[in-house]
Amino acid sequence: EGETYVSWYTFGDVYLSSVRTALDAAMEAKGLKVVDKDSNANQQTQTDDINTALVTGANAIVINLVESGAIGTAENLMNAVSAQNLPVVFFNRAVSTDNAEAEALFKGYDKSVFVGTDFTQAGIMQGKMIGEYVLEHFDELDLNHDGKISYVMFKGDEANQEAIARTKYGVECADEVLTAA
């Protein structure tokens, strides 16, 4: 009964398109009616859509926050959802750049949770994998045979705290592996 409302920061993100497909299938398999909304990378659109969902019968709210790392925005959305006594899940995009601040937000409402990765650890793992791969395949990767590997680093959305950390720690750890060799 009711709808699970899922607010996406954008439908244009390729990775999130695959997440959306899998999430919708999993929720529908549990008999949940899912309403997906595209915020088009606009926080005001997302906020307005969530407020509309709250007054039109949503029974749960799932949020892929447009403004990654914006604790004030996350607090406002949390307050709106908690005022309706509904469960809320924030996912994929950090609600704050400060872990203690984010933890306090979720401890303040017992029907809330954040689902995401340990992005520092993800970056470390990615960096180690890249470093080890380069060591094992150096001759293949040194295309101009100058003893250096040229690369281009693609990073996700500039505001996404997870993408920022994965890039930072990925490069640092790859460098550590290669420097140690």
Model-derived features with residue positions:
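A residue-level marker of the well-folded mature domains of exported/periplasmic proteins
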Residues: 1-181
